[in-house]
Amino acid sequence: LLKLRDAIGELIGVNFDPSHMMWMGGNPLTAIRQLEGAIYHVHAKDTRIDREHSDPNGLLETKVNERFRERAWNYVTLGYGHGDIWWRDFIALLAQTGYNGVLSIEHEDLSMSPLEGVRKSVDFLNQIMVREIPNQP
């Protein structure tokens, strides 16, 4: 993406979804730093790694999502994979690197209904979001 941006400019940017990097073993926070200024949209989506299944088999998962109890990783409701400290760091880093857009909740947690998952995600974000930023000199 960055090479493409070098070639054509800021016409193109990233729809950043941290959950994919999580299950691949990457670090979304490092990626945010590398993509500074190129993040145009952000998904608020979490992933839980189940070490009982991932340690002996790795993270490359071939079981269908509906077999979530047997999988090495699953998409989960916000806060059910990574806690509030991680998500605070994520949101703060997005702001520090110039992102001031929305966080779009993407619910794919099969352990609860979509309505409950979205409600829990909204409640979670409401608890950790910074609402008032002081004026900077």
Feature locations, PLM:
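Residues at the N-termini of beta-strands
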Residues: 41, 101-102
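Acidic/histidine-rich catalytic cores of soluble enzymes
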Residues: 1-80, 136
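Short, flexible loop/turn segments with low-complexity composition
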Residues: 106-107, 134-137
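Substrate-binding clefts and catalytic carboxylate motifs of secreted carbohydrate-active enzymes
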Residues: 92, 97, 113, 117, ...
